[in-house]
Amino acid sequence: MINLKNVKPILTPRFTPSCSDALMEKLSEIQKKYHLPMQSHLSENFGEIAWVKELCPNTHFYGEAYSQFDLFGGDCPTIMAHCVHSSDEEIALMKKQGVYIAHCPQSNTNLASGISPVRRYLDEGLHIGLGSDIAGGTSVSILRAMADAIQVSKLYWRLVDSSMKPLTVEEAFYMGTEGGGSFFGKVGSFKEGYEFDAVVLNDSTIPTPLKLSPKDRLERLIYLSDDRNITAKYVAGRKIL
């Protein structure tokens, strides 16, 4: 296979209802041969979960529809989008297998899928990052995803479970950087030994008469900035903008 430094292939079965057993078996063979990662989506809404159960009556929960083909973490690095309504058994298997969750708050809101219990995932030590799921969202901005994640976590706390505290700015920022970046290796952090993948943001276009701390400035950028605030981009230490 072609070895590109910054662009790598990933297996992407759309979701269980659109994939035959024969296809999943073949994907499993390809994964084991080339040691590829896999991405799909999981437990996004109740209708989908019921549909998967109907199609895969031998499974106890949605995640088993992937794990029965060895496509659910472990030796197969896996990202699962959404995980809005994952059962206790499914969550336990995701944690055991090291499955990454891509939280897509804007998509989940637009499609009325529900609110993912992100606080639980963080507290239980699952790997979780942020996604846009642009097919169901309106923006590919990870800063926007951070703001959306904080906002929907407040709704979950207020409307669903008052014991699940809303996300902090720091937690949302972590999810949008190292939380998801760690799936790809040592990216998403300024720690020693990590690749310098970064953007430079200029907040001078968001004026305020107040004296702000670095955290305050970051929070304003998360909520108020857009691509016009990006003044430079670096990939693996190389400036590309």
What residues fall within each predicted segment?
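Long hydrophobic segments that form regular secondary structure
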Residues: 86, 90-99, 104-109
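Short, acidic/turn-prone active-site loops that include or flank metal/cofactor-
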Residues: 44, 105-109, 134-136
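Divalent metal-coordination and catalytic microenvironments
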Residues: 11, 41, 80, 94, ...
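C-terminal cap of metal-dependent C-N hydrolases
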Residues: 195-241
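Metal-coordinating catalytic core of metallo-dependent amide/deamination hydrolases
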Residues: 1-83
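C-terminal active-site-proximal or functional interface alpha/beta core segments in diverse enzymes
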Residues: 80, 88, 108-115, 139-140
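His/Asp/Glu-enriched, well-ordered alpha-helical/loop segment
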Residues: 68-74, 119-207
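Helix C-cap/helix->beta junction micro-motif
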Residues: 33-34, 97, 124
